[in-house]
Amino acid sequence: PAFAETCPQYLLLSLEDNMLNDDMTDKGWEGAKYVFTPPLREKRNQPKLWEGLRKDNLQVVSTDHCPFCFEDQKALGKNDFTKIPNGGPGIENRLQLLHHHGVGQGNFSINRFVELVSSAPARIFGMYPKKGVLAAGSDADLVLWDPGALYTISAATHHMRVDYSMFEGFKVKGNARDVYSRGELIVSKGEFIGKPGRGEYLRREARGGAWK
């Protein structure tokens, strides 16, 4: 079988956005933040991506998280576009954006949201049913989600080690409140309280549940 993904930037950003309409000079250098592969397309393509998520033509929403700082690393390409490091940050805000614009705006159901961010990736990567499901014998990995929590995305408050956000100023409704990993509370009321070094190696099947 074949599997496909998209990312929040392709669902929510487009060539028509103002920050991309510059000439890559000192005055209009913001566009360097959005140099990644594949490049952004026209806004008219976005409804088809949402439709693909609803119909399971797209099985996963990832981020292609590849952060380069704007002030020093992206600036390497100021005199030569081809030297702009390719990639952008996004892993921290994936669930917030997908819940707000997916569930909150009626693009898919809450059940489909869970499938896209949990059970489908676990199957594809050969970790199901240890991950991606609440069942006897599975890891007790839980996210308690507050659908009414309001949050404004900003580089000033995010935890990623990068000096900008592709979604700066986006207002979202819905956020993780508590997170349990293997039954242990590691995020409480939005604050990380886990112990360093508690991770475990996950042996994956070469052909996991998605292939069966």
Describe the residue ranges of each PLM region:
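Hydrophobic faces of well-ordered beta-strands that scaffold small-molecule active sites
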Residues: 2-5, 61-63
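Active-site beta-loop-alpha junctions enriched in small/polar residues
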Residues: 7-11, 64-66
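Catalytic core of soluble alpha/beta enzymes
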Residues: 11-21
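His/Asp/Glu-enriched, well-ordered alpha-helical/loop segment
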Residues: 21-34, 55, 60-61, 67-148
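A short acidic, glycine-rich active-site loop
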Residues: 32-44, 84-89, 165-171
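Active-site glycine- and acidic-residue-rich loops that bind
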Residues: 36-51, 124-126
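C-terminal cap of metal-dependent C-N hydrolases
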Residues: 75-80, 86, 136-202
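Short, solvent-exposed cationic patches
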Residues: 201-212
